[in-house]
Amino acid sequence: MGALLKGCWLLIIVFLFFSVHSLPSLAVMDRVPLTVTLLQERLSAPVLKEGMTTINLANLVIDIRDENKELQEQFYQQIQGQINRAKQPLGLDFSNSLIQGNFIASRLGLPTPLTKVALATLLSPTEEQLLQQDENFLFDSDEPVFNVTVFRGPVKLQRTVFMGEVDFSKTFFLQIVEAMEAKFSRESNWVESRFARVAKFTKANFMGDVNFSQSQFLNKAIFRTAHFKSITNFHRSHFTAEAYFDQTKYDKTADFTRTFWEKEANFSQSQWRDRPLFSKSRFLSLLTFRNATFEKSGAFRSSYFNGVVSFQDVKLLDQVDFSNSTFTKNSYLSVSGLAFDSDKAKILGDRGVIGQAIYLPTLTGNETVLRNLVRNFRSLEQIADANQIEYKTEKLRFQQLKQKLNNISVIRLINLTWVADFLHTSFLALLLLLSQDGTNFSLVFGTGIIIFAYFGCLFWLIDRVRRLTPKPVIPSRYEIFCMVTSYIILTLSGVFNILQSASRPLLTLTAIALILVPLPLILVIELYRRGRYHDLMDSSYFLQDGSMRQLRLLITRLPVVPEFPLFRDRYTPISWQKRWNWLNYYDLSLNNLLKLGFNDWRVRDRELPAIISFLVWYQWGIGIFYITLLIWTLSRTIPGLNLLIYLK
């Protein structure tokens, strides 16, 4: 009994399976050949579909080839006459019909001149308002008139098969167009067509060339899962609302040049087997190619982007060109999961622009993407863009480390295993703030100016302003004026440089202030609190090598006077009597910071407060870090010094 029941269930399942898969063939078998008599019957008895009066021409075989001249003439004349005579909009339903021969829409619709005078007698105020959205609409009747074919009612082409050429050029659809699963066997012409309502071409199959150039979609355009097997042309088309081209396939060149997209343009999961051309187009909102595949080179040259451009999980087999394109502050190129699946796969763009535009949300899962992007720009010798990608990589790494520190467990906190992560995070934060990971020379230069000016002024202060009583040891007013003025000018120039070049200038200035101000300030306050009562009060703490005056590179020297007597005799203190002696303190600071100067400056080792010695060594240590950062940044930003170009 159980075996019998199983057998019955198996037969039912097999029956249902074949029933479902035979529905399309049954639908084809149900098609009835259209005759003149049947045409008249259908025209005399329109049906009500979705609230609209519709001429029912569904499930027919409509033979309007030149060999069937009588039916061809009657077909166009009677349908057009019925539409023209109707006071209310009439829809056309060709669903599941097979149309043989060329299909010419202008012989079916209502011929309408786009002038205010003509529309007032032909259409309702609502329809007239829709037509006025056309850019060719003329309010002045003295200008040349632009004529269109108007379909006032909905046009249904669901599963319609067109065996010949289709011509919907210069056609204005005032109601919805439904062409789901329609098949266009030969060329289809939609040049300068207008869609006032939703245009649905879901799962449409375009076997021949399709031309939507200069068309306007005033409502949603839905081409989801459509298949374009020949040349596709949307040149100069205008999409006012959302456009859905997701899961579409393009077997040959697709021309979307000079198109205008006011809302979202969705090309996710699309397949481009030939060249996609989007040059000189304008995208005011989201443009997504998520999970798309580009088998040939794509062009987005001279395009304008005002929203997110998503290349997430895209597979590139050839280059994509963004040269001369504009990315506004609201736009960026998201490349999370981007795969370079060929040696020819590249992203092209303007130097210093495309690297800035690229965006990735996280480091996790995108390490390979970032390496490929760096290799991509280095192979193109676009060092600034390669450095920008590496800078963004380190920013993402910093965010990852910071998040890791924020989620420290109690056990790790007690065991101090977080210290290494903390030091790594702090050092990385410093690199990002002071040099953008060695990619911004202007930022490093501005930082150096501030450090150089600060310590020059600090050394002048502790050396020249020693005490007020009983015998004052202070500089002249002229010297004070020169030093303060020069310090302000140098510091402001460094700050201005940072404000211009840093991504987060306030944080950068804060980091510099934390390095320069707290510790030296505490030590200077302590120095003046204690007072100075040692010998040699009338002599400078800083000595110069007077044996020669020349520009010197003194990387290996230490800031203390030599011990050997013959060498010590060459060093003399700064002369306070000369009016320009304040410049020596800047030379000292430059020497201590960059190991470069016009004199070899040292600090004396007799009658020297320990605080002053510490401050000199403190700047010397900062100088080691700074000169390393400077050389590293120069090696990454000057192409001739960047050997990594040649070492992939």
PLM feature segments, named:
Residues 2-648:
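Terminal module of membrane-associated proteins
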